[in-house]
Swiss-Prot record:
Subcellular location: Cell inner membrane
Species the sequence originates in: Escherichia coli (strain K12)
Keyword set includes Repeat: no
GO cellular component terms listed in the entry, alphabetical order: plasma membrane
Encoding gene per record: nimT
Upper lineage: Bacteria, Pseudomonadati, Pseudomonadota, Gammaproteobacteria, Enterobacterales
NCBIfam families named in the record: CynX
Stated name of the protein: 2-nitroimidazole transporter
Function: Involved in efflux of 2-nitroimidazole.
Membrane topology: Multi-pass membrane protein
Length: 393
């Protein structure tokens, strides 16, 4: 199974369905707890810092576990590694739902480990089985992840309020990994490519010394940083400019929808171009303009939120597509994915608290927002480098 043409029509559909369901699981189990954080904090009398750790802990798990995903896939194969990732997520959901604050944090960390494996391995799997459809399938699963984020946020509060409680609502999220496991069973049974030749395995270990790999990594990594800064602080930024909590919440939801929209458009564009430098720089600059607009013209926050959200979502899709396009093999793609996501999520975990401290020191959001704009300009430069039509050797 080295390319999409070697898959029968039925097997191809089942594989794509499995990929999209795994993508749904990776996002919905991460974002689903966010609307219940205040309820969880009250239930366990957590401090604000402890509550914030529930959001940061998965990001730290992503950063720590991501580099291990490619070696695991070389040892056990991508199919079985993804199956194990889904089992970890199921176990984490069960542990997180038990009545103990310690198990709440422990389960959250386990979920983060499972998500990290899945995040890293999906681009490699797409590179291996759909080498001529990397952009389209990456766009499809990115769009699926965006929709899943909205679904997770929308479903847990009604469940919690209608007899399930917050623990039951979080436990109900197990439906997603269980369905993904069911759809992934055929891939477990047809397990292939469990091992990689020694020379190619050694080749993937040198990924950290490749300038092109670092350009892809920093393009994705800076986007993760600026996205998590804005997604974390946008309501506070808007409220400081006179918006109501309801208005700020609506714009926060609009931001998440805007990040999903490029999944429909970017793959169509990428299908016709081999050199992605122009589009990579353009979407990164959209993020910069959005941040500057929020800083100096907050009255037009809808425009700036849409602009930033579309730019960041498009950057993520481009970055994930670069992983497949710039890697010369499926396992090198997994290694590059692990590198990019490890660095990216480490930056993402540090960004929101750092920008929060800068805000506290200055008393306003101007410096953090201009920091996001400058970082976005730097991201555009790395996009110009990563968008060249060449592979890592």
């Amino acid at each position: 199974m080295t390319c999409s043409t070697s898959l029968s029509g039925k097997n191809r559909i089942v594989l794509i369905a499995g990929i999209l369901m795994i993508a749904t699981t990776l996002r919905v189990t991460f974002t689903g707890a966010a609307p219940l954080l205040d309820t969880i904090r009250s239930a366990y009398s957590l401090t604000t810092a402890q509550t914030g750790l529930l959001t940061t802990l998965p990001l730290l798990a992503f950063a720590l576990i991501s580099p291990l995903a490619a070696p695991v896939a070389r040892r056990f194969g991508m199919e079985r590694s993804l199956f194990a990732a889904l089992l970890l997520i199921c176990a984490g959901i069960a542990i997180r739902s038990l009545p103990s604050p310690y198990l709440l944090f422990g389960g959250t960390a386990v979920i983060g480990g499972g998500i990290a494996l899945g995040n890293v391995l999906l681009p490699g799997l797409i590179k291996r089985d759909f080498p001529h459809s990397v952009a389209r399938l990456t766009g499809a699963y990115s769009l699926t992840m965006g929709a899943a984020a909205a679904l997770g946020s929308a479903m847990v509060v009604p469940l919690a309020l209608n007899g399930f409680g917050w623990q039951g609502a979080l436990l109900m999220l197990m439906c997603f990994p269980l369905l993904a496991l069911f759809l992934w069973l055929p891939q477990w049974r047809s397990q292939q490519h469990a091992n990689l030749s020694t020379s190619r395995a050694l080749h993937t270990r040198g990924i950290w010394r490749s300038p092109l790999a670092w350009q892809v990594t920093l393009f994705l990594g800076i986007n993760s940083l600026v996205y998590y800064v804005i997604i974390g602080w946008l309501p506070a930024i808007l409220i400081s400019h006179g918006y109501s909590e309801a208005q700020a919440g609506s714009l926060h939801g609009l931001l998440q929808l805007a990040t999903a929209a490029p999944g429909l458009l970017i793959p169509l564009f990428l299908h016709h171009v081999k050199d992605q430098r122009g589009i990579a720089a353009f979407v990164a600059l959209m993020c910069a303009v959005g941040a500057v607009g929020l800083c100096f013209m907050p009255a037009h926050a809808i425009t700036w939120t849409l602009l930033f959200g579309f730019g960041s979502g498009a950057t993520m899709i481009l970055g994930l597509t670069f992983i497949g396009l710039r890697a010369s093999s499926a396992h090198q793609a997994a290694a590059l994915s692990g590198m990019a996501q490890s660095v990216g999520y480490l930056l993402a975990a540090c960004g929101p608290p750092l920008m929060g401290k800068i805000h506290d020191a200055n008393g306003n959001w101007s410096v953090p927002l201009m920091g996001v704009a400058i970082l976005s300009l730097l991201m555009a430069i790395f996009g110009l480098c990563a968008g060249r039509d060449k592979e890592i050797r």
